[in-house]
Curated annotation (Swiss-Prot):
GO terms for biological process: cobalamin transport; cobalt ion transport. GO terms for cellular component: external side of plasma membrane; extracellular region; extracellular space; lysosomal lumen; plasma membrane. Disulfide bonds join 21-267, 83-96, 116-309, 165-205. Belongs to the eukaryotic cobalamin transport proteins family. It comes from the Eukaryota. InterPro entries: Cbl-bd_prot, Cobalamin_Transport, Terpenoid_cyclase/PrenylTrfase, Transcobalamin-like_C. This is Transcobalamin-2. It is found in: Secreted. It comes from Homo sapiens.
Amino acid sequence: MRHLGAFLFLLGVLGALTEMCEIPEMDSHLVEKLGQHLLPWMDRLSLEHLNPSIYVGLRLSSLQAGTKEDLYLHSLKLGYQQCLLGSAFSEDDGDCQGKPSMGQLALYLLALRANCEFVRGHKGDRLVSQLKWFLEDEKRAIGHDHKGHPHTSYYQYGLGILALCLHQKRVHDSVVDKLLYAVEPFHQGHHSVDTAAMAGLAFTCLKRSNFNPGRRQRITMAIRTVREEILKAQTPEGHFGNVYSTPLALQFLMTSPMRGAELGTACLKARVALLASLQDGAFQNALMISQLLPVLNHKTYIDLIFPDCLAPRVMLEPAAETIPQTQEIISVTLQVLSLLPPYRQSISVLAGSTVEDVLKKAHELGGFTYETQASLSGPYLTSVMGKAAGEREFWQLLRDPNTPLLQGIADYRPKDGETIELRLVSW
């Protein structure tokens, strides 16, 4: 009996040493306001604007949009299956000018799991095959010596593995090996926090599903490595990397308990930073909101292994319309210094305008041209003054003197007197 008591005491001590990443509840009105930002996006049902992440975020949140959710999922199924399957063996894309990427396909598979569905039947098999072909193609691009790079990114590579895992679809060890190699400390290049977090979520799903048993030890070590790297990336304010990579980082950390108090302390600090960012209105982008809402409901993408589709959720009501006040005119300087001849022009716009509004006004005034492409996180620049971003290049937004902007052209709202620079950079 004495030995049993000692054993139970030891178990209690070990349990006390294990810390979970827990985010205390936030003000429900603040969370509801966040969810209300997604409602207008759910009325945009064209293929270009459909975003599976919005559906996933709502289903894993404490909020619901009622019949809007059903219509949105129906539109996702119609659009994605028509474009991805209708042209799977044909060069003719028909009306699918904005054919979904493989990253979008992976998120679509997450959306199905968020509705407690598995891909099944002939159509489902073809979708799975397309995602597996994508991973194989990326694997070849990385190369057997790991000196190459994915055509897209390791973020999309990890997302693809996660999506297949959630649907109980196995991928070959050689596919997992590329992601393992990318995060292992003795091979590790520089990866952003959200890329590391997505890889960590993929590894966590593989481990919990008992997939790739021959890689189990490496997967366990990779989860530990990712956790350590994310914790190291915490800023003095409390964000992991930056404010917009913090939600996905928290999703991973919430699935990855560790001994000691470091994890719990870091997550509480992140919660304080997130609260301040929410109160400042930092979260306006639909993709970022959809990654944060599950965290505020103590959920992660890993919950899609066994989703709870009957959990009670509060009905969202549209935000009350505010009567616009008379807006002042502000002056924003737009400059492009990485091209010859350089461009620099003062642009007058309404206060509250986005960078995209500034670009449109500059184009209307003449002497400035640009092109954009839609993505799940919003439009991004593909060409400025006739100069297209090449492979492994992108047009970066900076606030003068030299501060990279974390938000995209449709989200950042410059203040009066600010200078916005568009700079072509390599990565």
